[in-house]
Amino acid sequence: MNKYELVYILKSNVEEEKRNQLLDKFRGIIEADGTIENVDEWGNRRLAYEINKINEGYYTLVNFSAAADVPKELDRNLKIADEVIRHMIIRLEK
């Protein structure tokens, strides 16, 4: 299993209940064939630049270990979610 780091930014007006639902959805995808090591919610922050006329976003960092196919499925689900402004998944060095 490889180690990965996921950062995703949600629209800042998303309610806490919806944020938790999304985190649970992403957590389910990861835990189907991996383990979550850490979830760090950074909260609302100003974006470095405007994205689709949005200036603020809710940042979340997730560190996890998983099989090689998990990031592809996670990426697909992050792209589909309307509340996600941006996301990035990187593989960490061994």
From Swiss-Prot:
SUPFAM superfamilies: Ribosomal protein S6. CDD domains: bS6. One of its GO terms (biological process) is translation. Signal peptide: none annotated. Binds together with bS18 to 16S ribosomal RNA. Keywords: Ribonucleoprotein, Ribosomal protein, RNA-binding, rRNA-binding. This is Small ribosomal subunit protein bS6. Belongs to the bacterial ribosomal protein bS6 family. One of its GO terms (molecular function) is small ribosomal subunit rRNA binding. InterPro entries: Ribosomal_bS6 (IPR000529), Ribosomal_bS6_CS (IPR020815), Ribosomal_bS6_sf (IPR035980), Ribosomal_S6_plastid/chlpt (IPR020814), Transl_elong_EF1B/ribsomal_bS6 (IPR014717). HAMAP family: Ribosomal_bS6. Pfam families: Ribosomal_S6. One of its GO terms (cellular component) is ribosome. The gene is rpsF.
